[in-house]
């Protein structure tokens, strides 16, 4: 045996000081060419113009008690054939390995090893001219028990860092945005306000990126909370979609937001799923105005711009003549609109149910200001806490599920034939409902992200 080689067994404890890994159990396999280490939430980014990668490592098999956040320079991307014969393109990093009293630099590919028996595989390239393998032995360089390993990680697990969450919006001073930032920071997370207009995309099959004005790359986020104003729907959803392609969790997905923002499409989806809505009509030509009015039971009726929110672009036409004038005026501007039956018995009131993760976490009754028929808070309406019926609760939950929204403000109106769905909002305001109920809605939104990402405070 050469003097500079040492014997290792079929499994050994390794360390990677540069990655902050004091102990990780490795399967030693001279039949495998490359070495790999467990990595999840792998995200490429640039540092001083060079390619780097960030990733999370759970160093103990079958345990998420310890989570390490690692960064390393990328030296390559390679197609690696896994043990099941599948080809996977992996990032390759280099780091110094410590085995017993020996240390040298090895190359590691990053991959999810949750389905494997070991968090690390030590292949023959890493062992070349360094070791001899005795497959009949284990832990030739020393065994460590669970208590010893947890003690090695004690400082890191006690000081576990929070998540990095981006708030994708337009105005940092709005009540809702301030509350979300505040709620995240109170829970120990790093909250980053991202102005939608200052984000831009790099479309690249191997290195997609989201940039922020000034050159900062945003690929290192754990999650984004899209709060997209209607005028920014197209670009905001494109940004959200790009974050999703980087395996960054979106509290509401781009597809769900797109569905909910298209009022006609959303009503069609609700109708398809047998959810009750006010009778509505849609036509392309002013020639069909009279039939459209008759379709919803005649005047009085509601005329809605498809692009409107917060009660804007909604008109009550009290007579047939007024309805014809409003519809034809809107059509002359080449805008899309809906006509909808007017629910007189609601008396200027509606319900807002706030849904998070399939639960109605809060509900309020909104009442229109004197002389106004719209109950929206932004139109001067008032809010009061209300207890909703089981039917109303189920309607709200089914509506959010139909849209695919994890977080939704569902508007319901009480009619003589039962509760009817008015609208599902993917960026519902927090001020009215938090003020009326005293419930920490912003905190519940952060809780949803923590639950989805499996994050728990120590």
From Swiss-Prot:
Cofactors, names only: Mg(2+); Mn(2+)
Protein name, entry field: Probable alpha-L-glutamate ligase
Residues that, per the record, bind Mn(2+) 1: 411, 423
Q: Which InterPro entries match?
A: ATP-grasp, ATP-grasp_RimK-type, ATP_grasp_subdomain_1, Peptidase_aspartic_dom_sf, Put_Zn_protease, RimK, Rimk_N, Rp_bS6_RimK/Lys_biosynth_LsyX
All copies of the ATP-grasp domain together span: 267-450
Residues bound to ATP:
304, 341-342, 350, 374-376
The entry's Mn(2+) 2-binding residues are 423, 425
